């Protein structure tokens, strides 16, 4: 009996969680989220007043959701969902990282990693050459 109860519980959890997926998240709606912000839902009564004044609800918006326009420099800056195969990833400096042009971005990353590793190795070698200059943690 307990095994059957456990099996039914697992099947119910799988059925409930099957439709819940945050894989594509905001990109499925044509805008970007950079994490940590969540969905912002402000005062919905103000939106209700605006829609009631015009007498028409805005069809594209739902209560509690905001639509952020894409950056004007993006190659596909429409409000619609990007077509499949259009993998455009915004980067922090406001530019766009296109997967087809990944070679240049990889080279920049290699140079940055090389500089970090070189700096670390230089510090390590310097500490090996001058052991009296380093900090020592004495046993308590």
Swiss-Prot record:
The modification Histidine amide is found at residue 37. Disulfide bonds join 26-33. It is found in: Secreted. This is Neuropeptide CCHamide-2. The keyword 4Fe-4S does not apply. It comes from the Eukaryota. Residues 41-140 form a propeptide. GO terms for cellular component: extracellular region. Expressed in corpora cardiaca (CC), corpora allata (CA), antennal lobe (AL) and gnathal ganglion (GNG) (at protein level). Expression detected in few animals (at protein level). The keyword Secreted applies. Keywords: Amidation, Cleavage on pair of basic residues, Disulfide bond, Neuropeptide, Secreted, Signal. It comes from Agrotis ipsilon (Black cutworm moth). Ligand for the CCHamide-2 receptor CCHa2-R. One of its GO terms (biological process) is neuropeptide signaling pathway.
